[in-house]
């Protein structure tokens, strides 16, 4: 039977341009992160439900649980498009997945570049976030544990200095403050005591009333912002490796989805050609 010049070569009925390897690799790739996203949302929702209503509303902007829920929901929606799109060979869902993942990757890249170029503004924003967290230190147990962990890990106290704790109503040094913690700092600011079996939670009592030299004998007096900046400078290669580790899965997801979309389009063209070929033997 003659074939019209320029028409595609004939393929068997069982032939498919869509590679099962690419299809199911993309599916299981998204399934893994889909499960992770559901766990993140579940943990975030559980953490929110365990808090008192007043505390939950007071520190909404600096609540780690909210961040966990938001990131989890966005990841869930994104990986849903990837999972269903690859399994059902749906071009629309796959292109949505690829586009969103590309936007996320570019936003991360832009944030890194802008953070490096406008480091002073980033420093000011970080200081604002830390001060806001200090204000709500006693309002949220998760936030309190996060701050305590950060101060102990980086051997620091407050944002700029230990006196930043006056921003908190319980640690404020004003004369009319009835709190027993007036002019104090949290125990996580205290220097570690060797062979101490029980943590002295009152070790920071009255530390804000002391000058820098006197306070430095008992607590960390350096602010956490400077410590954080120094830590970043000392661990640039490690942070670069982490950034690369985050970028590679995103680039792999973008690449696999684009390859699969191209294969699906070729398969659609083949099906259309076969239909026309059966309808017109001279095609």
UniProtKB/Swiss-Prot annotation:
Keywords noted in UniProt:
Cell junction, Cell membrane, Cytoplasm, Disulfide bond, Glycoprotein, Membrane, Transmembrane, Transmembrane helix
Annotated membrane topology is:
Multi-pass membrane protein
**Record's protein name:** Tetraspanin-33
Q: Which residues lie on this side of the membrane: Extracellular?
A: 46-64, 118-235
Taken from the record, one Pfam family name reads: Tetraspanin
Q: Name one GO cellular component term.
A: adherens junction
Family the UniProt entry places it in: Belongs to the tetraspanin (TM4SF) family.
Specify the superkingdom: Eukaryota
Check the record and name the Gene3D superfamilies matching this protein: Tetraspanin
- Gene that encodes it: TSPAN33
Q: What the protein does? A: Part of TspanC8 subgroup, composed of 6 members that interact with the transmembrane metalloprotease ADAM10. This interaction is required for ADAM10 exit from the endoplasmic reticulum and for enzymatic maturation and trafficking to the cell surface as well as substrate specificity. Different TspanC8/ADAM10 complexes have distinct substrates. Plays an important role in normal erythropoiesis. It has a role in the differentiation of erythroid progenitors. Negatively regulates ligand-induced Notch activity probably by regulating ADAM10 activity.
Q: What InterPro entries does the entry give?
A: Tetraspanin/Peripherin, Tetraspanin_animals, Tetraspanin_EC2_sf
**Which residues does the annotation flag as glycosylated?**
172
